Regions:
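C-terminal motif of bacterial Sec signal peptides marking the signal peptidase cleavage site
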Residues: 17-21
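A residue-level marker of the well-folded mature domains of exported/periplasmic proteins
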Residues: 22-361
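Bacterial N-terminal signal peptides that target proteins for export
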Residues: 1-9
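Repetitive helical segments and hydrophobic/amphipathic motifs
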Residues: 12-13
Length: 361
């Protein structure tokens, strides 16, 4: 993949926000399925139109809304029609219903953040048999269910980054826990497995992973799971939440219960939601966290879909394609034997830069 320096990514993020603001996607939900459909403005992209669909994990998640905003921005540049669907719940069943609806509509492509690695295969393979181009984005599906995967960052890189954060924040020893999304979420599961692999190194020997809890990417359930962890493990030192919903819920619990100086927090979070909780003192629970720009993830997903539809790529290793303001990307081999396009490395947010980014996304 062509390397891009952080300053380029940051300029892209700022440009995205200037175009779309810091809110969610611009579509209005209609119907029981939560479909948002918008017709993009005329553009000068070689794809020359097309209908591009995005199915996110679930509704009510600001991360998903910003990802959808980036998707719609790119489709507008491509001169096509964007259809965004947000399932009511983060389940494979809700997504299967939406896939079938999109197949019936005759869309040109479907990009999906999978709620289950394998359960979507019958519906997605049926879509591909109809000539619809299918890619996964943000959360993967199996290799038979996609042509390529738009990945935020490499799984091993995320696992190493988060594990090193736990090691640093804990002082190198003690109990820690993970607060994840759903137990079927392919992306979180891959990151957690990578963290466990990293933990096999001797330098992590004094750290004890006591539990992986699941908040299902629902705020209240994530609050409940955080409270349960605190009750079950009074000696807990660190919670790592590789989910934007989970980290925000955990931060609120630690603040409300006066535990910000006792139990520390790290993971993946949105700067706009976590700014009040990031700091180096006992009044702040999160010394630092990581993420990428979800607007860029959605933006790259749309350009990937367009390249598949136009035939510029098939999803094979070493194919390259332009992705608007983000530049050129190269398809690489994924850990599961399929292929992927990686947006870029995770970025660290701490007390020194959070004010700079909290108004961006």
């Amino acid at each position: 993949m062509k390397k891009r320096v952080l300053s380029v990514l940051f300029c892209a993020a700022i440009t995205s926000v200037l175009l779309f603001g810091c809110g969610g996607s611009s579509d209005d939900s209609t119907g029981d399925s939560g479909t948002g459909e918008s017709t993009a403005a005329d553009g000068n992209a070689e794809a020359g139109g097309g209908t591009y669909a995005l199915i996110t994990k679930a509704s009510g998640n600001p991360y998903n809304e910003k990802e959808a905003a980036g998707f719609e921005e790119a489709v507008a540049e491509l001169g096509g029609t964007a259809i965004v669907k947000h399932p009511e719940k983060a389940t494979a069943e809700d997504q299967i219903t939406m896939i079938n609806e999109l197949v019936a509509q005759g869309v040109d492509s479907i990009a999906i953040a999978g709620n289950d690695f394998d359960a979507l295969q019958p519906a997605l393979t049926a879509a591909m048999e109809k000539g619809i181009k299918v890619s996964s984005v943000d959360s993967n599906v199996n290799t038979d269910s996609r042509q390529t995967f738009v990945n935020q960052a490499g799984n091993n890189e995320i696992g190493q980054t988060l594990m090193d954060a736990v090691l640093d924040i804990s002082g190198g020893e003690g109990q820690w826990a993970i607060l994840s999304a759903t137990s079927q979420a392919a992306n979180q599961n891959a990151w957690i497995e990578s963290m466990k692999t990293v933990m096999e190194d001797d330098k992590y020997a004094d750290l004890e992973l006591v539990e992986v809890a699941y908040g299902d990417d629902e705020y209240q359930k994530s609050v409940d799971q955080t409270q349960a962890l605190l009750q079950k493990y009074p000696d807990l030192k660190v919670i790592c939440a590789p989910t934007t919903v989970g980290i925000m819920a955990a931060a609120k619990v630690l603040q409300d219960e006066g535990l910000s100086g006792t139990v520390k927090l790290t993971g993946l979070g949105l700067p706009s939601e976590m700014a009040d909780y990031i700091g180096d003192d006992d009044d702040h629970s999160c010394p630092y966290m990581y993420l990428w720009n979800p607007i860029d993830v959605g933006y790259l997903s749309a350009y990937t879909s367009a390249a598949l539809v136009s035939g510029d790529i098939t999803g094979a290793v070493d194919e390259t394609f332009p992705a608007g303001k983000l530049g050129e990307y190269t398809i690489t081999e994924a850990n599961d034997g399929g292929t992927e396009v990686i947006v870029g490395p995770p970025f660290k947010f701490d007390s020194g830069n959070i004010d700079e980014w909290k108004d961006v996304y």
